[in-house]
From Swiss-Prot:
Annotated source species: Aspergillus fumigatus (strain CBS 144.89 / FGSC A1163 / CEA10)
Superkingdom: Eukaryota
PROSITE patterns reported in the protein's UniProt record: THIOLASE_1, THIOLASE_3
Name by which UniProt lists this protein: Acetyl-CoA acetyltransferase erg10A, mitochondrial
GO molecular function: acetyl-CoA C-acetyltransferase activity; metal ion binding
Subunit (UniProt): Homotetramer.
């Protein structure tokens, strides 16, 4: 048998390619193959109430919560379900959740089995990143309508036990807390995320008093917002089945847990050497909840979304990475990129929604970006409303959209463990021409 040399094979391939028209090649550079980037719009948004850790949603899985948010968002959008081709849902703590959490949420929401689904894990930024990914499909002309959001049930995260081959032949066995292992632990430095917040507070000279005062403000704003019914349009009630029948959960559960007289007396949660400033009071809580948005092309928005309360144009998105220990200030890297891509300045932004992982996160980013006098988290944030990891990014976006007035710009930004952040600029609309 003759041996074919590489040179001979290459010569024949070149000759064959010469007879293959450029217009039929997969990677054609012809102008006819290029497509213009399209606009992506948000048609609706909804979120479940955010429940306390071991609270009302302890028996409801993350995908089931996600399904409630998806079903509500789709209903509000007016978009026929047959137009939706993809679902992107953030979910961080996937131990014992079951295969393909986003697929579960899509199916439980009643979407067609032909709808493709993808689960996104960018830690706290998962929900907002899911929206960015869905928007890209529309911008590239690959889809007409998408669903995106996030979901988490921190109450149901299991403890981990290594397989038998990794266990000692005798003696004690130690369980790992899945909540800490996969959600709250800095893998690179081997300490709690709260230590990162402590280092940020020290670096940017943010005192314990400043952090406590910000936390009190967050609770007071959330309480005022609920009193004034400002969350009514975004909430999707959750029906929870129990031994005594069904209970409908319609309100966030933690925002009333403020005792101003106790705030200053709380002990530091992470540094106990006398220098700690981060406490359970000025940090976000552990929670369960979900949020979802429906995105569409210009044609879809024009046909189905006129007058929708959450109608908005996605102007730009951005991600940025930083040293893992500095993750709290990663939004200060992502936001300028998003603003530059949007072609606007920070002074043109009407409302900012930053995730309140810790009070130190907000104070540091305000200081770096010069937002001390801006409208940042006017209705409270994760400290008072809760931080259900995979949902938080899309939750702040849903809340942002329901605050903006037509024509106004808003920015949602969220840091994530590992040293990164995602930011998004949106513009509120009342119609699409």
């Amino acid at each position: 048998m003759a041996i074919q040399t590489t040179t001979g094979l290459a010569a024949r391939l070149v000759a064959k390619r010469a007879t293959f028209p450029a217009s039929r090649r997969n990677f054609s550079a012809s102008r006819s193959a290029l497509k213009e980037i399209q606009e992506a719009y948000i048609l609706s948004g909804a979120r479940t109430p955010t429940a306390k850790f071991n609270g009302s949603f302890v028996s409801v899985s993350a995908p089931e919560l996600g399904a409630v948010a998806i079903k509500s968002a789709v209903s509000k959008s007016g978009v026929p379900v047959e137009k939706i081709t993809d679902v992107y849902m953030g979910n961080v703590l996937q131990g014992a959740v079951g295969q393909a959490p986003a697929r579960q949420a899509s199916m439980f929401a009643g979407l067609s089995p032909t709808v493709e689904s993808m689960t996104v894990n960018k830690v706290c930024a998962s929900g907002l990143k899911a929206v960015a990914l869905a928007a890209q499909n529309i911008q590239l002309g690959l889809a007409e309508a998408q669903v995106a959001g996030g979901m988490e049930n921190m109450s149901r995260v299991p403890y981990y036990l290594p397989r038998s081959t990794q266990l000692p032949p005798f003696g004690e066995i130690k369980l790992q807390d899945g909540l800490i292992q996969d959600g709250l632990w800095d893998v690179y430095n081997q300490f709690h995320m709260g230590i990162c917040a402590e280092k940020t507070a020290k670096k940017y000279e943010i005192s314990r008093e400043e952090q406590d005062q910000y936390a009190i403000q967050s609770y007071q704003r959330a309480q005022a917002a609920w009193k004034e019914n400002k969350f009514a349009e975004e909430i999707a009630p959750v029906t929870v089945k129990g031994k005594k029948g069904e209970t409908v959960v319609e309100r966030d559960e933690g925002y009333e847990n403020l005792r101003i007289d106790k705030m200053a007396t709380l002990k530091p949660a992470f540094l106990r050497d006398g220098t700690g400033t981060v406490t359970a009071g000025n940090a976000s809580t552990m929670n369960d909840g979900a949020s979802a948005l429906v995105l569409g092309s210009k044609a879809i928005a024009r046909e189905f979304a006129q007058g929708n309360r959450a109608l908005a144009r996605i102007v730009s998105t951005a991600d940025a990475a930083i040293d893992p220990v500095d993750f709290p200030v990663a939004p200060a890297k992502a936001v300028p990129i998003a603003l530059e891509r949007a072609g606007i300045t920070k002074d043109q932004v009407a409302v900012w929604e930053f995730n309140e992982a810790f009070a130190a996160v907000i104070k540091a980013n305000e200081k770096i970006l010069g937002l001390q006098n801006a409208r940042v988290n006017p209705l409270g944030g994760a400290i008072s409303l809760g931080h259900a990891l995979g949902s938080s990014g899309s939750r702040i976006l849903v809340t942002l959209l329901h605050q903006l007035q037509p024509g106004e710009y808003g920015v949602a930004a969220i840091c994530n463990g590992g040293g990164a952040a995602t930011a998004m600029v949106v513009q509120k609309l009342d119609r699409v021409d």
